[in-house]
């Protein structure tokens, strides 16, 4: 029998002196640190899994329950009321003498930016899938995000106790929908109501959990007779899968002595770190089964900071990032470097900046350089966070994820370094908002607070934007979906005590061009007795989808001063903020500056800006402008009795049904629907399915609006 040990807090001072005083031995070896994220589709059981991890590692005395609104990680009122994760939350725990820094990320598509910035600074991830649903739409999104950052993963097939749970089907969905190479390292004993434990394929033992202590202890017993053949076949498949991608294990597998569990474990680790395989565990977090195996997998298979490539940054030349790069190894002896990946307004500690330390050490009270702003900042406090609780630290070291108090000016994505060794890390990028609505204060007192509250939330959330409508003067807030903006407004009223009125949500359309044109702009005007003159020629062409606006200066060297070329580019980009059909941003344009005329003493920045913006707008009008709308990938799950009504309703909303499949006793409809047609869909689906249907959606792409719909949108804009 394996028994969970006594409660031991993972906190503790690092016990090191300030920068420059010499590096003392680490409390936790760098090889024993795991920086991981927990990621999943909404309702896969991600937060419940995190709560069980905290319980089994001794971080909490009793696991929190999502349904009761009593979880450690979902501490916002809005999270507890809705039973979902809205903001990523950080915590730390210990397992087998390893420190595990965990970031629990949201599963709802509206909060994908939280996942994006977390994956940027993490070394590994746990992907949680529902044993019934398998891979779902948001699962695909976060998986692609992890692919982009090259983050090694393990998977946990959760909810094996639920009706319709099927481990094999869930694993197969990873192959079909993610293109992954999953390798089960545990198998379920039973399913649905009969799920009672797991088989460890490395040890070839069964684990039967004890209900009286919430699964903290379990019996190790021989594999049940009826599962021996399946388990042996699965272990052979596991060894063969690893041997195919790991030469060292292949030699052992073909040798006479066979493969020991330790050798197999080492081979799985190498294959996981290389991104060739994904170890898969199974269990039920709610029913306290299988989570300890997952913890073992985090320690055994996910990378330490030493296992990840060193960071590369650009060296500053006269304060500007140049083409020359520098490498920072994950080592306490290297110059300090870190990335600020999250800003949070804490009611007790003030403004917090979460950072990942990539190299060197940093002591409280010391000064760092914010390379992104060029400003020196003194660190007042260093904190290790446990959701909304905090523990003071004397020092942060390589591999640590900590919160910092003391920055006067900092943004998500800023690079922090030692003053004497500056370099700039790549900035973080986020998807553009797809929805917006007007907001106004109810009273004069609210008006004074509105701007500060909106700015504070925009600082926290890079996917949330605040803009002024240039025509009406209204304040407009932009976000990733209805729920995103609903949460913003709710926080305004609860946290910032600002009463406000909001308009109806509107779709964030975009504009582009359909053909290549040449356009000219000229500005010649006498202002205050001085002539202002500039003339430019632009070639405007359709660009690659998702490319934004690209600008190339093709004017002969020396024919135009560089500062004027810079003003032209800045004006072109600014002009693209307002389109020519309905005032929506112009995107995916390839702009070339091919002509320019200037006169010494008469040409100015203002002149070139006006000439360039005029040329851009005139050219866009002549280039067959096109209105674009966001189209969503929609997945609707309903009982078979309602399939016809729901499908017909989707078709009536300009939806395209692209496939159907059976999932347990339900039918799953895969469709693509314009976002504007999905407003209020949750209410209508409840009516169509007698409350038994559920749906999820995520952005697929932008595509041209049908001509009839586009005419109505432009008519409303012209009459505004």
What are these regions (language model features)?
Residues 2-720:
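Structural and coupling elements of P-loop NTPases
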């Amino acid at each position: 029998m394996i028994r969970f040990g006594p409660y031991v807090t993972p906190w503790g001072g690092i016990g090191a002196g300030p920068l420059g005083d010499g590096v003392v031995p680490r409390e936790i070896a760098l090889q024993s640190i795991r920086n991981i994220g927990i990621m999943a589709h909404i309702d896969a059981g991600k937060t419940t899994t995190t709560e069980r991890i905290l319980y089994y590692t001794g971080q909490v005395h009793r696991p929190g329950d999502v349904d009761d609104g009593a979880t450690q990680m979902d501490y916002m009122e809005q999270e507890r009321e809705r039973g979902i994760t809205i903001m990523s939350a950080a915590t730390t725990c210990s397992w087998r003498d390893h420190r595990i820094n965990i970031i629990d990320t949201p599963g709802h598509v509206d909060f994908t930016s939280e996942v994006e910035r977390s994956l940027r600074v993490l070394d590994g991830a746990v992907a949680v899938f529902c044993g019934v649903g398998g891979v779902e739409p948001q699962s695909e999104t976060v998986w692609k995000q992890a692919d982009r950052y090259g983050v090694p993963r393990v998977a946990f097939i959760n909810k094996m106790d639920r009706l319709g749970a099927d481990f094999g089907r869930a694993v197969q969905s990873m192959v079909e929908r993610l293109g992954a190479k999953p390798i089960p390292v545990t198998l379920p004993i039973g399913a649905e109501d009969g799920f009672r434990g797991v088989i460890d394929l490395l040890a070839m033992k069964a684990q039967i959990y004890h209900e009286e202590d919430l699964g903290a202890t379990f019996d190790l017993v021989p594999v049940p007779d009826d599962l021996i053949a399946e388990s042996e076949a699965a272990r052979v498949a596991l060894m063969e899968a690893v041997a195919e991608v790991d030469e060292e294990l292949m030699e052992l597998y073909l040798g006479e002595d066979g493969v020991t569990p330790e050798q197999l474990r080492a081979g799985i680790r190498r294959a996981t770190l290389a991104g060739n395989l994904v170890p898969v565990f199974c269990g039920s977090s709610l029913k306290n089964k299988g989570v300890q195996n997952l913890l073992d997998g985090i320690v055994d298979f996910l990378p330490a900071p030493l296992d990840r490539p060193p960071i590369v940054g650009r060296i500053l030349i006269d304060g500007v990032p140049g083409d020359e790069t520098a490498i920072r190894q994950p080592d306490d002896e290297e110059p300090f470097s870190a990335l600020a990946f999250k800003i949070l307004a804490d009611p007790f500690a003030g403004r917090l900046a979460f950072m990942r330390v990539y190299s060197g050490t940093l002591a409280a009270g010391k000064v760092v350089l914010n390379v992104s702003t060029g400003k020196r900042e003194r660190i007042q406090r260093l904190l290790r966070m446990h959701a909304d609780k905090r523990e003071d630290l004397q020092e942060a070291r390589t591999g640590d994820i900590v919160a910092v108090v003391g920055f006067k000016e900092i943004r998500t994505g800023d690079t922090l370094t030692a003053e004497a060794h500056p370099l700039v890390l790549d900035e973080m990028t986020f998807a553009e908002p797809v929805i917006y609505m007007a907001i106004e204060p109810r009273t004069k007192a609210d008006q004074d607070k509105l701007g500060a509250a909106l700015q504070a939330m925009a600082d926290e959330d890079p996917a949330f934007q605040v803009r002024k409508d240039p025509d009406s003067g209204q304040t407009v807030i932009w976000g990733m979906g209805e729920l995103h903006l609903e949460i913003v407004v709710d926080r305004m009223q609860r946290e910032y005590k600002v009463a406000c009125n909001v308009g109806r949500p509107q779709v964030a359309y975009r504009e582009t061009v359909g053909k290549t044109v040449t356009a000219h702009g000229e500005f010649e005007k006498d202002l205050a007795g001085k002539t202002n003159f500039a003339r430019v020629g632009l070639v405007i062409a359709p660009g690659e989808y998702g490319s934004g606006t690209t600008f190339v200066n093709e004017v002969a060297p020396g024919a135009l001063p560089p500062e004027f070329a810079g003003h032209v580019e800045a004006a072109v980009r600014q002009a693209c903020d307002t389109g020519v059909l309905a005032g929506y941003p112009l995107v995916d344009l390839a702009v070339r500056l091919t002509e320019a005329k200037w006169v010494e003493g008469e040409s100015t920045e203002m002149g070139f800006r006006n000439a360039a913006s005029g040329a851009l707008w005139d050219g866009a009008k002549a280039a067959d402008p096109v209105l674009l709308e966001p189209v969503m990938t929609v997945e609707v799950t309903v009982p078979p009795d309602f399939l016809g009504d729901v499908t017909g309703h989707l078709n009536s909303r300009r939806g395209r049904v692209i496939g159907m499949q059976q999932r347990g006793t339900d039918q799953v409809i895969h469709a693509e629907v314009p976002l504007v047609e999905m407003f209020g869909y949750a209410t209508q689906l409840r009516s169509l399915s007698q409350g038994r249907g559920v749906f999820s959606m995520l952005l697929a792409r932008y595509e041209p609006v049908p001509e009839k719909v586009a005419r109505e949108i432009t008519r409303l804009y012209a009459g505004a």
